[in-house]
């Protein structure tokens, strides 16, 4: 990260270990106003932090297109994830990821709220068109290759929805309580995300609206810290759904 030809403090810190104590020193330099702006006013973007030289980054929705209701610029509309999965062609998924990533970059975006890799648990799920399959391995492979392709184009992807957003219908997605055994959770629903982190180097995820048991997925320490970071070694960012 540069400013007027000089590397900023953030620029020097990039590439350091996730647990490097210098990150704490860097964060201590943020002003109250900057932290407020970062957390409260970051709709489809990550705001600038002038004190440490962090620029604004812009994101856009759309698993099948770089563009959505929240942006005026649109890229090409691609076949949905289910159609892609039916090809069983991981190489094609990588090409798709690179293509949509290049379009996002051309339109001035830095990241995408995509792809989505929840399960086709029921034909009545209102978001099935965004998801690949009822098969965890196929979903994780196709999604992982898509993320790899976008990364080659310089675009990061917030893969969604972590986790179990498999029963959304109408406007009640924030009131869905999901119950299952831990074995089912790990072997079916978490598996694609585990592959993304451990095998494909995913750096960003989007949490889901629903609850796992009685705990909101976006506020679950068991999911977001114990499993995602402590077990899988995820060092990236998690954004809540909106």
Question: How would you label these PLM feature ranges?
Answer:
Residues 1-242:
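Glycoside hydrolase catalytic-domain context in secreted enzymes
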């Amino acid at each position: 990260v540069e400013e007027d030809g000089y590397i900023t403090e953030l620029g020097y810190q990039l590439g350091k270990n996730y647990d490097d104590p210098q990150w704490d020193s860097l964060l201590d330099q943020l002003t109250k106003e900057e932290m407020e702006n970062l957390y409260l006013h970051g709709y489809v973007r990550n705001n600038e932090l002038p004190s440490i030289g962090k620029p604004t980054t812009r994101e856009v929705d759309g698993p099948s297109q770089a563009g959505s209701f929240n942006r005026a610029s649109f890229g090409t509309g691609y076949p949905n994830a289910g159609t892609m999965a039916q090809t069983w062609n991981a190489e094609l998924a990588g090409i798709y990821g690179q293509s949509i990533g290049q379009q996002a970059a051309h339109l001035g975006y830095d990241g995408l709220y995509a792809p989505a890799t929840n399960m086709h648990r029921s034909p009545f799920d209102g978001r099935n068109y965004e998801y690949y399959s009822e098969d965890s391995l196929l979903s994780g492979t196709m999604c992982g290759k898509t993320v790899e392709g976008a990364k080659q184009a310089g675009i990061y992807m917030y893969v969604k929805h972590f986790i179990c957003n498999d029963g959304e219908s109408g406007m009640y997605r924030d009131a869905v309580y999901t119950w299952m055994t831990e074995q089912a959770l790990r072997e079916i629903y978490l598996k694609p995300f585990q592959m993304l982190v451990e095998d494909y180097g995913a750096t960003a995820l989007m949490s889901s609206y629903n609850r796992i048991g009685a705990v909101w997925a976006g506020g679950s320490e068991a999911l977001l810290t114990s499993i995602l970071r402590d077990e899988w070694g995820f060092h990236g960012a998690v954004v809540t759904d909106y």
